[in-house]
Curated annotation (Swiss-Prot):
Name of the protein in question: Autophagy-related protein 21
One term under GO cellular component: endosome
Sites bearing Phosphothreonine, chain numbering: 213
A Gene Ontology molecular function term of the record: phosphatidylinositol-3-phosphate binding
Family per similarity comment: Belongs to the WD repeat PROPPIN family.
Compositional bias ranges of the Acidic residues kind: 75-84
Species of the source: Saccharomyces cerevisiae (strain ATCC 204508 / S288c) (Baker's yeast)
L/FRRG motif, short sequence motif: residues: 342-346
Modified residues (Phosphoserine): 237
Ranges annotated as biased composition (Low complexity): 46-57
Additional remark text: Present with 6020 molecules/cell in log phase SD medium.
Alphabetical list of Pfam families matching this protein: PROPPIN (PF21032)
Residue spans of the WD repeats: 294-334, 346-385, 448-488
């Protein structure tokens, strides 16, 4: 399958079995409800002044072309892109590789076809499936990597590590987040801070602040003009394992969570790592929280709960799944951001999907193994951070995570320097601050064919069921057991 994914509430499943054909199936009752052939569909043409015309105009359907930072291209640029198209299509991207996102069970769907070359991969179509027409097209300056949306916002991630945020009611651009530029500016600010602390820079505080402001302004200007190759020419999203991820909550709060580049380490000044996660309120267009070093490795998979209060993460190792409080609650404590931890297994795994159910009682995990795991969030056997009953052994990664999130870990001056008192103090502090090493395993599991890629969906209407769609064209419904064990297959269908 070129595309295989559920919509936000698992009422529909999007399938692209061939290079140019996209189908949408209802999950209950099961059946095909929409189909489009992108190869034979009528093309839209635009004139020189940027307006657009569409063959659907005969039916009085309006079609709009929106550009974001694009301009008229020269012959040399077109020729260069044609060469890039041949390289990318032949060696990296398979023909007909789509980026698709549905808007729940409505008639709106966003489609980007990356398999038709770089130029086509920069164009996002908003399609009305009932009227079978394109409502609008948005042209971006770089290829589209991912699209997420809910009833309030649409967010588009580009290969240039930029996130465009739109008001979905009118497709008005609200904000552009540049992940790589922000990382560069943070690195420059850290360098400046270190230099000022060590006395490398001399002068009063006002002069130092002026130097810092000019430094950040120059970094921003260079990125805009394209004169800073470390900021703007980086193109890794489709070609590297290190790739930014983003997820958007389904409710109207519209909480966006995306991975961010970590500040380079002292021994690796040019290192690039996605260890951090940013929590962003797209409704008010403002950041909410910053989770630092959620994993020791690069964050490879994200999931956010329906209301945006919980965030699940997994690294490129795929052995441990962590659940964090996002910080959108008024009673949020930054020192207690880690909520739960689960161990998927000891064997390394490439995880490509995490998913919460709507009630936030369960989280599903899908990877390139023969098992799909379901973890229970309300399982009392999995001790919370800060539970004084924790008495396991702690590894280095967990200690670093806890000490970073809890700066208060340390020996108070008022404690007498006696060995028993110090040992007792550290024992209590460590037990109250570090998660249990004896992490909970899955509550339920589903055995699948390891050679087939699968995706998972929790239907809102049936809380005790889970949907599984596989590359071999099967759609399966499983019943979640009341006690720990294997899920029971109740129904099986084929995408035909």
């Amino acid at each position: 399958m070129k595309v295989l994914q559920f919509n936000q509430d698992a009422t529909c499943c999007v399938v692209a079995a061939s290079s140019h054909q996209i189908s949408i199936f209802n999950c209950d009752p099961f059946g095909k409800c929409f189909e489009i052939d992108t190869k034979n569909s009528k093309k839209k043409t635009s004139n020189n002044n940027g307006s657009a015309s569409n063959s659907e105009s005969r039916n009085n359907e309006e079609s709009i072309l929106i550009t974001n930072g694009s301009r008229d291209r020269t012959d040399a640029e077109e020729e260069e892109d044609n060469e890039d198209n041949a390289l990318v299509t032949g060696n990296i991207l398979k023909e007909g590789e789509f980026v698709i996102e549905m808007l729940f069970s409505t008639s709106l769907i966003a489609i980007a076809d990356r398999g038709q070359g770089l130029n086509k991969g920069k164009k996002l179509k908003i399609v009305n499936t009932k009227r079978k027409c394109t409502i609008c097209e948005i042209v971006f300056p770089h290829e589209i990597v991912d699209v997420v949306m809910n009833r309030k916002r649409m967010c588009v991630l580009l290969e240039s590590d930029q996130i465009f945020i739109y008001d979905i009611s009118c497709m008005k651009p609200l904000e552009t987040i540049d992940l790589w530029e922000d990382h560069y500016k943070r690195s420059q600010a850290n360098s400046f801070s270190n230099a000022s602390n060590t006395g490398t820079l001399e002068g009063d505080s006002a002069n130092l602040n002026r130097v810092a402001t000019n430094l950040l302004a120059n970094a921003t200007q260079k990125s805009v003009n394209g004169s800073n190759p470390s900021v703007r020419t980086r193109r890794n999203s489709l070609r590297s394992k290190i790739r930014p991820r983003m997820v958007l909550s389904n409710d109207d709060r519209s909480i966006l969570c995306f991975t961010a580049y970590s500040s380079p380490k002292k021994n690796k000044p040019n290192s690039e790592a996605l260890y951090d996660v940013v929590i962003y309120d797209t409704l008010n267009v403002t950041p909410v929280n910053y989770l630092n070093s959620v994993h020791k490795g690069n964050v490879a998979c994200l999931a956010v709960s329906h209301d945006g209060k919980l965030l699940a993460t997994a690294s490129d190792k795929g052995t441990i799944i962590r659940v964090f409080h996002t910080g959108v609650d008024s009673d949020y404590m930054s020192s207690r951001s880690l909520f739960k931890e689960f161990r998927r297994g000891t064997r390394l795994c490439n995880l490509y999907q995490l998913a919460f159910d709507k009630s936030m009682t369960m989280i599903g995990c899908v990877g390139d193994t023969d098992t799909i795991h379901l973890f229970k969030l309300d399982d009392a056997s999995n001790s919370l951070p800060g539970d004084n009953s924790s008495n396991g052994h702690w590894n280095e990664e967990e200690y670093i995570l806890a000490s970073n999130s809890n700066p208060s870990m340390g020996t108070p001056k008022e404690i007498p320097l006696s060995k028993p008192r110090i040992a007792n103090y550290f024992s209590k502090k460590i037990k109250s601050s570090i998660p249990n090493q004896n992490l909970s395993r899955n509550f339920a599991y589903i055995t699948v064919n390891e050679s087939n890629r699968s995706c998972l969906g929790f239907p809102d209407e049936f809380p005790n069921q889970v949907y599984i769609a596989s590359d071999d064209g099967t759609f399966s419904i499983y019943s979640i057991p009341s006690k720990p064990g294997e899920c029971v297959l109740t129904k099986n269908n084929k995408f035909t």
